[in-house]
UniProtKB/Swiss-Prot annotation:
Protein name: Acetyl-coenzyme A carboxylase carboxyl transferase subunit beta, chloroplastic
Gene3D superfamilies per the UniProt record, alphabetical: 2-enoyl-CoA Hydratase, Chain A, domain 1 (3.90.226.10)
Biased composition (Basic and acidic residues): 40-50
EC number, as in UniProt: 2.1.3.15
Top-level taxon: Eukaryota
Source organism per UniProt: Gossypium hirsutum (Upland cotton)
A GO molecular-function descriptor: carboxyl- or carbamoyltransferase activity
Length: 497
């Protein structure tokens, strides 16, 4: 005997009842049985008097004597939703919240009998005696089809709301209080149960047979797909790109050609010859020099979080490599590490890289991607601007060596005001956001509206702020030509590509 379950919920006073509906293999509607285990002889006698659903008068006459709302906690371990999708196909979904198992049933003959049963009940004399009109919260929809949400969203919402009810049940319901007119289970089934708790969603993974489904909880829908898909950041696109193919295409959107943010490791791989990367000062980590006070979390805890998230020790990677066989010193900032903010360690690593390039007569390339100086280190982070600029003065003016700065999106604040704009050649990526102060800060300070696009690379290029705008595809070749133009050549002439 296969069983399918449904909730019969009547929001009249304190009446709540769950019954089970047995379905035989020949799709005939069997007797209605009470699933409650109760030793009350009066109630057991009542249950024995319930006959087949075809004997509707006998069944309906006994409904209002079945179960009090105080026993509701005994009935909410499983549930079934009757759903109709956008194609008008009907489904019954049963789930056991303890085992987190779902069963999907689209047996049309059985569902037709269920539908007939509920509609006949809805039109019965019991319902027409004023109960529906007197109870403002009564609402039962056999097939709840929310036009504002998709099929999956509605199922997720119902499941989410139901599981929330397993954790936190209104105390007035548990205590049998008279203030129980707002039938929370009825609201949940009818799609009125409110928002999901803490933004959590539930995903249904279907087995091959299409009947059994398993519930899986995740903190966010995006978490399920972030390792597979990347959304374009362009406000005119927002296209979705497959992550594996995106890496091979240099993080350039397939739909609109927008240059997405890149991890520092990916950019290093893009910029230099394979197998030539030699990192420097990897063991340098940030402390808390000013014991920064924060209501949210400690500065050290934030550093630890981003170290685990990115696998980096700081917001920049510095080292040496070869550019088509030409030895270079290169530093690449990573915006994923605290917004690429420049603190004491970032400033020290850049300064040491410049000094190494000065002593070894190497061309220098710095890739900027930063929100500016790190506020958690106060004036110590601002001091890095002067320290780096001083080292660059010796490198450029005294040693007459060649420095290229590459501005990617975003480059703002103290980085823009220091080494970002000190390159002998300043290269910008297409559509890069380049500014000293952000748009919102300027508007709040000057009480003026900033035109759209006034801080984009293309607009600033026409104002003479930097030299070329170079896409990522030819960037390595352009850098190689610039370096050779300034007198730096490959160690092995055969390595020129």
């Amino acid at each position: 005997m296969e069983k399918s379950w449904f909730n019969l919920i009547l929001s009249k006073g304190e009446l709540e009842y769950r019954c089970g509906l047995s379905k035989s293999m020949d799709s005939r509607l069997g007797p209605v049985e009470n699933t409650t285990v109760n030793e009350d002889p009066t109630r057991n006698d009542t249950d024995k008097n319930i006959h087949d659903c075809s004997d509707s008068s006998s069944y309906y006459s006994k409904v209002d004597h079945l179960v009090d709302v105080k026993d509701i906690r005994n009935f909410i371990s499983d549930d079934t939703f009757l759903i109709r999708d956008s194609n008008q196909d009907r489904y019954s979904i049963y789930f056991d919240s303890e085992n987190q198992i779902f069963e999907l049933n689209n047996d049309h003959s059985f569902l037709s009998e269920l539908e007939s049963f509920f509609y006949s009940y809805h039109n019965s004399s019991y319902m027409n005696n004023g109960s529906k009109n007197d109870e403002p919260h009564y609402h039962f929809n056999l097939y709840d089809n929310d036009t504002n949400c998709g099929w999956n969203n509605h199922i997720n919402s119902c499941i989410d709301s139901y599981l929330r009810s397993q954790i936190c049940i209104d105390s007035s319901i548990l205590s049998g209080s008279d203030n129980s007119n707002d039938n929370y289970i009825s609201n949940y089934i009818c799609g009125e149960g409110g928002n999901s708790s803490e933004g959590k969603n539930f995903d249904i993974i279907t087995r091959e047979n299409g009947n059994d489904l398993t519930l899986k909880e995740s903190s966010n829908d995006l978490d399920l797909y972030k390792d597979l898909w990347v959304q374009c950041e362009c406000e005119n696109c927002y296209g979705v790109n497959y992550k594996k193919s995106l890496n091979s295409k240099m993080n350039i959107c397939e739909q609109c050609g927008y240059h997405l943010k890149m991890r520092s490791s990916d950019r290093i791989e893009l910029s230099i010859d394979p197998g030539t990367w030699g990192p420097m000062d990897e063991d340098m980590i940030s402390l808390d020099p000013i014991e920064f006070q924060s209501e949210e979390e400690l500065y050290k805890d934030r550093i630890d979080f981003y170290q685990r998230k990115t696998g980096l020790t700081e917001a920049i990677q510095t080292g040496t490599g070869q550019l088509n066989g030409i030895p270079i010193a290169i530093g690449v900032m990573d915006f994923q590490f605290m917004g690429g903010s420049m603190g004491s360690v970032v400033g020290e690593k850049i300064t040491r890289l410049i000094e190494y390039a000065t002593n070894n007569f190497l061309p220098l390339i710095l890739v900027c991607a930063s929100g500016g100086a790190r506020m958690q280190e106060g004036s110590l982070s601002l001091m890095q601007m002067a320290k780096i600029s001083s080292a660059l003065y010796d490198y450029q003016s005294n040693k007459k060596l060649f420095y290229v700065s590459i501005l990617t999106s975003p480059t703002t604040g103290g980085v823009t005001a220091s080494f970002g704009m000190l390159g002998d050649i300043i290269i910008a990526e297409p559509n890069a956001y380049i500014a000293f102060a952000g748009k919102r800060v300027i508007e709040q300070t000057l009480n003026k509206t900033i035109p759209e696009g006034s801080q984009a690379a293309e607009y600033l290029f026409h104002k003479g702020l930097f030299d070329p705008i170079v896409p990522r595809n030819p960037l390595k070749g352009v850098l190689s030509e610039l370096v050779q133009l300034h007198g730096f050549f490959p160690l092995n002439q055969n390595s020129i590509k």
